[in-house]
Amino acid sequence: MEGAAAPVAGDRPDLGLGAPGSPREAVAGATAALEPRKPHGVKRHHHKHNLKHRYELQETLGKGTYGKVKRATERFSGRVVAIKSIRKDKIKDEQDMVHIRREIEIMSSLNHPHIISIYEVFENKDKIVIIMEYASKGELYDYISERRRLSERETRHFFRQIVSAVHYCHKNGVVHRDLKLENILLDDNCNIKIADFGLSNLYQKDKFLQTFCGSPLYASPEIVNGRPYRGPEVDSWALGVLLYTLVYGTMPFDGFDHKNLIRQISSGEYREPTQPSDARGLIRWMLMVNPDRRATIEDIANHWWVNWGYKSSVCDCDALHDSESPLLARIIDWHHRSTGLQADTEAKMKGLAKPTTSEVMLERQRSLKKSKKENDFAQSGQDAVPESPSKLSSKRPKGILKKRSNSEHRSHSTGFIEGVVGPALPSTFKMEQDLCRTGVLLPSSPEAEVPGKLSPKQSATMPKKGILKKTQQRESGYYSSPERSESSELLDSNDVMGSSIPSPSPPDPARVTSHSLSCRRKGILKHSSKYSAGTMDPALVSPEMPTLESLSEPGVPAEGLSRSYSRPSSVISDDSVLSSDSFDLLDLQENRPARQRIRSCVSAENFLQIQDFEGLQNRPRPQYLKRYRNRLADSSFSLLTDMDDVTQVYKQALEICSKLN
């Protein structure tokens, strides 16, 4: 630690950023425009000084590519600090030096209670030494790894503070670009402190950035596909990954290889555990693949879930999103919350009774009746596999909506990735320190079986990678991340274009049967999954009507199959003159007169629509028409025309009936 500079009055507040006009000066000049600056600024020293005279160095907090971070105590004041030492001889890439200096300038310019503060900077020809705020509780990563699952109140506490800090950065024109659990620290009071601005940069709304950096597990679709981006949208995506991890205790995107991870992120495909959480709507909004539809930091800060239980919102700004997504997401979240509370109350009153088959079918039908945009944000049924955004225009029949046997479903998913998480990502990601960790027990291991933690069965169905990584291969949150990579390293075009998505398996016969039965028209009433006695009167059922077994045999056309399930063929025949609307209004009785005229089940206006009365005599008679004449009775006469002409209409109807006879 020898050779650092001593404080000297009048020192210029620069770090040797180069001659006028150089790229370094441009970086310094840009960051100097940040407002507001700290009241007293950051001391920068370039004169020889021995830091050991001022600070008592203690244990090492973390090691990085260019040096290490140590805890230290200032001898004069007793203040505990973190000292980050960077060796210049290990910096081979000029771009890395630019990032280090940019980090110092940006962090020195930001003043927020949830962002790590820089107190002093020392530099000589060999080293750059940064004296910064010390966060005694360590990384949020370790905090979650020890507890596996946080309460919603604690999750909201952490996430509000993270959003507050990110909103402050965006408000001052700074995008972090490397938000992850390892870069979020906790102080003595378990308050958030965001660190590591090594990949941060200034942004402007009318300009695009093209540096593809960050951690792959938190990278947005724009980053992994090498598309230009403005900046804040990549932080919004990372916030979605963070919130998912805080809520569920695992990572949303857990591809076990390069190609799979790229596909998952590009399609926004992630597992959504079935344990209820009111934050799932906000998570989906932040993990929208289209950056124009993705929640902005203002949308997140004003979301009801983030501010639930607090007197004020995270920020006093207005949401800038023009789409209907915020309102829709709020309505859907409220619906889920109210439905869940009502279900819990009913379960307690009924002695925790299980839902009946009819209730499950009703819930599935409700989910299918939702609009396309609402289905994009929420799923009402836990047993329904949602459609991918590319297939929203073509609705799937209910017959192929399969129940998930592993008590999980996927959000924005078109397939399910089977198998255990395999090897870590290849070296192209430069993320050895982010993919595996050995210091924490796997939930599936016997040693991890402790009360209050996930059972082995639950662990087997959740992503095996989770957030467990190797301690020795991961840098400290105080340290700059060397994970910058170009688009050519992150993606081979054939990987995305050539990747295939598993198609859903064909439905089984039982599922097809249930689908067909549920498609009957509204005139047929169902009670407890069985048709009413009046509808299924044995006298009404023709002995010649095909059975389910006969319809499933070869040679029966598909058209006949659909007709037979929905109604008797005599009712829905193309040649029939019976009004389907009038038929639906019938109240079939057990005992009816032996003979009634056809007007009891026919609307007069149906006959008035027929122009060619003579042609009716040559048309084939509807099947089973005589049987229905004998059985149907006492129905009201439907007449939608002007009531003043009722006599004339009635006479015309009688004339038509006589021609039919």
From Swiss-Prot:
<feature type="region of interest" description="Disordered">
    <location>
        <begin position="1"/>
        <end position="24"/>
    </location>
</feature>
<dbReference type="GO" id="GO:0001650">
    <property type="term" value="C:fibrillar center"/>
</dbReference>
<keyword id="KW-0479">Metal-binding</keyword>
<feature type="modified residue" description="N-acetylmethionine">
    <location>
        <position position="1"/>
    </location>
</feature>
<keyword id="KW-0963">Cytoplasm</keyword>
<dbReference type="GO" id="GO:0006974">
    <property type="term" value="P:DNA damage response"/>
</dbReference>
<feature type="short sequence motif" description="GILK motif">
    <location>
        <begin position="399"/>
        <end position="402"/>
    </location>
</feature>
<feature type="region of interest" description="Disordered">
    <location>
        <begin position="442"/>
        <end position="570"/>
    </location>
</feature>
<dbReference type="GO" id="GO:0006468">
    <property type="term" value="P:protein phosphorylation"/>
</dbReference>
<feature type="region of interest" description="Disordered">
    <location>
        <begin position="345"/>
        <end position="421"/>
    </location>
</feature>
<keyword id="KW-0547">Nucleotide-binding</keyword>
<dbReference type="Pfam" id="PF00069">
    <property type="entry name" value="Pkinase"/>
</dbReference>
<dbReference type="InterPro" id="IPR017441">
    <property type="entry name" value="Protein_kinase_ATP_BS"/>
</dbReference>
<feature type="compositionally biased region" description="Basic residues">
    <location>
        <begin position="518"/>
        <end position="529"/>
    </location>
</feature>
<dbReference type="GO" id="GO:0005654">
    <property type="term" value="C:nucleoplasm"/>
</dbReference>
<feature type="compositionally biased region" description="Basic residues">
    <location>
        <begin position="393"/>
        <end position="404"/>
    </location>
</feature>
<keyword id="KW-0832">Ubl conjugation</keyword>
<keyword id="KW-0130">Cell adhesion</keyword>
<feature type="modified residue" description="Phosphoserine; by PKB/AKT1">
    <location>
        <position position="600"/>
    </location>
</feature>
<dbReference type="GO" id="GO:0005634">
    <property type="term" value="C:nucleus"/>
</dbReference>
<dbReference type="GO" id="GO:0002039">
    <property type="term" value="F:p53 binding"/>
</dbReference>
<dbReference type="GO" id="GO:0005737">
    <property type="term" value="C:cytoplasm"/>
</dbReference>
<feature type="modified residue" description="Phosphoserine">
    <location>
        <position position="22"/>
    </location>
</feature>
<feature type="binding site">
    <location>
        <position position="84"/>
    </location>
    <ligand>
        <name>ATP</name>
    </ligand>
</feature>
<dbReference type="GO" id="GO:2000772">
    <property type="term" value="P:regulation of cellular senescence"/>
</dbReference>
<dbReference type="GO" id="GO:0042127">
    <property type="term" value="P:regulation of cell population proliferation"/>
</dbReference>
<keyword id="KW-0539">Nucleus</keyword>
<dbReference type="InterPro" id="IPR008271">
    <property type="entry name" value="Ser/Thr_kinase_AS"/>
</dbReference>
<dbReference type="GO" id="GO:1901796">
    <property type="term" value="P:regulation of signal transduction by p53 class mediator"/>
</dbReference>
<keyword id="KW-0067">ATP-binding</keyword>
<dbReference type="GO" id="GO:0005524">
    <property type="term" value="F:ATP binding"/>
</dbReference>
<comment type="subunit">
    <text>Interacts (via GILK motif) with PPP1CB; the interaction is direct and bridges NUAK1 and PPP1R12A. Interacts with CDKN1A.</text>
</comment>
<comment type="function">
    <text>Serine/threonine-protein kinase involved in various processes such as cell adhesion, regulation of cell ploidy and senescence, cell proliferation and tumor progression. Phosphorylates ATM, CASP6, LATS1, PPP1R12A and p53/TP53. Acts as a regulator of cellular senescence and cellular ploidy by mediating phosphorylation of 'Ser-464' of LATS1, thereby controlling its stability. Controls cell adhesion by regulating activity of the myosin protein phosphatase 1 (PP1) complex.</text>
</comment>
<dbReference type="GO" id="GO:0106310">
    <property type="term" value="F:protein serine kinase activity"/>
</dbReference>
<keyword id="KW-0597">Phosphoprotein</keyword>
<dbReference type="GO" id="GO:0046872">
    <property type="term" value="F:metal ion binding"/>
</dbReference>
<feature type="binding site">
    <location>
        <begin position="61"/>
        <end position="69"/>
    </location>
    <ligand>
        <name>ATP</name>
    </ligand>
</feature>
<feature type="active site" description="Proton acceptor">
    <location>
        <position position="178"/>
    </location>
</feature>
<dbReference type="GO" id="GO:0004674">
    <property type="term" value="F:protein serine/threonine kinase activity"/>
</dbReference>
<keyword id="KW-0007">Acetylation</keyword>
<keyword id="KW-0808">Transferase</keyword>
<feature type="modified residue" description="Phosphothreonine; by LKB1">
    <location>
        <position position="211"/>
    </location>
</feature>
